[in-house]
Amino acid sequence: MLVMSITFSFVAVALLVYFYVKVRTSFSPDAYAKTMQQEVIKMIRDIRYEADIAVQMLEKKIGECNQVVRTIDRKLTLLNEEILKEHTARTLFRASGAGQETREEVCARPEHRSAPSRAGSSAAKPTPTKRGTIEVYNEKIIRDNGLRAESPLLKDAIIALSEKGLAPEFIAEKTGKPLGEVQLLINLSR
């Protein structure tokens, strides 16, 4: 029995030493540092993973924004070309004097022979000279059919811009036409 108690004593001392070393290493500053280092490494991995996902999403959004910018740039280029064409056409139209007639030409038409003074204003009437039954005026007038003389070109430009997907408000702003007139032209073209 003595042997057994000595054996148990050695086992107890061995267990005591083992648990002492185990507790001392588990709660030592080195153990805390090692545990913290492992947690920091794990957090760094998580942050890198989340950052990679965020960068991929950001790159995707940047690509979409670049596509939208290219589309807008293409539409603005087309719009500038159309505005330049419309401005050139308007300038040529005004320079050629098209759309203007003298009162002599208007009064020479059969439908205007009976009432030559209808087109004149009451403020300052030019003096007519008689040539048979046609009164000749030297003042120039512009035919007015409800729309301006340049409206066929402008109408085509408005319709083309609306077919390209531009908003009626934007078209009205850029062409100088009222919004209602632009919307009417767009709706009539459909």
Curated annotation (Swiss-Prot):
Keywords: Membrane, Transmembrane, Transmembrane helix. It is a single-pass membrane protein. Its main location: membrane. Residues 103-114 have a biased composition (Basic and acidic residues). Residues 103-130 are annotated as: Disordered. The chain crosses the membrane at residues 1-21. It is found in: Membrane. It comes from the Bacteria. GO terms for cellular component: membrane. To B.burgdorferi BB0265. This is Uncharacterized protein TP_0711. It comes from Treponema pallidum (strain Nichols). The lineage of its organism: Bacteria, Pseudomonadati, Spirochaetota, Spirochaetia, Spirochaetales.
